[in-house]
């Protein structure tokens, strides 16, 4: 079973994404900030990380940088409510950029693209 980490400071988003991904057959872990995300990356052989950009304690951009230092092969999808970040996406080392939405089809499509069986 493929393992996904959902890191977001908004509990409702974490739960929404986690439940949807579990229904799709993935094992899902959750983190409320970048520091928690790094701890999980260190302990669990993940297949994908979905990372919010704005989080307390350590933001998603810094967490992304550290994740890619440790696991350059691990796909990381940046997720945000702020569409204006799209112009900055190319300068970050993430694999994908996703604007949060209640329509989870984009999320599922991105996950399937990176976790093809």
Where are the predicted features?
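Receiver (REC) domain active-site loop signature in two-component systems and cognate sites
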Residues: 55
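Acidic catalytic/metal-coordinating carboxylates
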Residues: 33-36, 59-62
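Charged docking surfaces used in two-component/phosphorelay signaling
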Residues: 15-23
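Short hydrophobic/Thr-rich beta-strand motif most characteristic of the beta2 strand and flanking loop
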Residues: 25-32, 40
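Conserved sequence signature across two-component system core domains
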Residues: 7-8, 31, 49
């Amino acid at each position: 079973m493929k393992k996904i980490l959902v890191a977001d400071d908004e509990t409702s988003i974490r739960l929404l994404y986690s439940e949807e991904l579990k229904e799709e057959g993935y094992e899902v872990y959750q983190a409320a900030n970048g520091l928690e995300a790094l701890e999980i990356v260190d302990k669990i052989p993940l297949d994908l990380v979905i990372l919010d950009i704005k989080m307390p304690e350590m933001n998603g951009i810094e967490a992304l940088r550290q994740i890619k230092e440790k696991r350059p092969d691990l796909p990381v999808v940046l997720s945000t409510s702020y569409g204006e970040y799209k112009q900055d996406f190319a300068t970050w080392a993430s694999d994908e950029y996703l604007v949060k939405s209640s329509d989870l089809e984009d999320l599922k499509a991105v996950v399937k693209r990176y976790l093809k069986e």
